[in-house]
């Protein structure tokens, strides 16, 4: 597809740019490759598997990744936040903030970097008042959090919000002199902990390293026992099968006596 459009200066954009940036397209399968140019502002034309957004893209909103021109991270999130379904767009915004502010080595979130980037995005959104999807984009940027590690955690955040839980703490650090653990969700209003379990934690060598699946399960059990005994809070796990709807996740939490305060 790239060879068919090399003669054009139009950069890849929207979901296609998100792919180039390594951002997850959670529950969204693009039907076309997206590019943007400035022929007729606001029109989207589809031809031969290409969706051409005829909108202006300034030079400082164009970067090159692997030799391929695409929209900048900020412009990509701006476009996606306005045009993709809410869950897909939140996963993209969370992942973009993670690129900006998360240090994977030290597991530290640079709140200053995150705030600076979010403010720039808010200013961009404010300048586009009245554009298609701008209300959703504004909500998403206020909701986005780069501490969400996986798209399933982003979706979990949305469903917890819909269920009426207070904003959870993410990647909560729990430690004593001999232990250091991180928990995905601190559900403080329910005095509980939550964990989203992607299947890769137990099966993907990238996540489990040299350990066998059984060794991973045993280490997780020891970790959970320590967290429960130390914090005196329940810990509930859920997986992708529980993210079908707020009701589905709510039922999973209720099995452990965890409900949003009324």
Question: Can you name each region flagged by the protein language model?
Answer:
Residues 1-133, 149, 260-262:
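Short gly/ser-rich loop at a beta-strand->alpha-helix junction or flexible surface loop bordering the NTP-binding
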Residues 8, 101-262:
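Surface segments flanking catalytic/ligand-binding clefts of nucleic-acid enzymes
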